[in-house]
Amino acid sequence: YAYREKYDYETEFEFGQRVANELERKIEELGSQNVMAFVAEPVVGATLGAVPAVDGYFKTIREICDHNGVLLILDEVMCGIGRTGTLFAYEQESIAPDIVCVAKGLGAGYQPIGATICTDEIYAAIKNGSGFFQHGHTYIGHPLAAAAANAVLDVLLEDNILEKVSGLGAHL
């Protein structure tokens, strides 16, 4: 991240481009046919203290992934569902991942729940393939958790909570 890794002569944008291009070089080294996905947190959570990527970083990462046929998977378990002023943190870079994982904001502390959201293309591949997505956890598909998540999303969107988060975030 920029605090420790940015050279004195670089702007934050230049730093972001330099480290994003490290992905391009690694994909070239390995061969794009050997790289399935790039996984990252748009806002690094527990290991760094809620630090977002520098502007432009994820836009370049998206371009690199698209150019090489590599999926972009974003982990928004901690930062997603309104916690950054947009429904998803990645929206602030005007990109969309192929797969995004969300959790904590989805239940808003009322009920533990998580979700994996994917593009229509990935969904169709699963549906038209085996039609089965293998996963399993004790509380998977719990109706109370799903109802709580629906209620959280309703309030978040209907009560303009995202606008309030953006305003308060700018103030803080």
Residue positions per predicted region:
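Conserved N-terminal phosphate-binding loop of PLP-dependent enzymes in the Aspartate aminotransferase
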Residues: 1-172
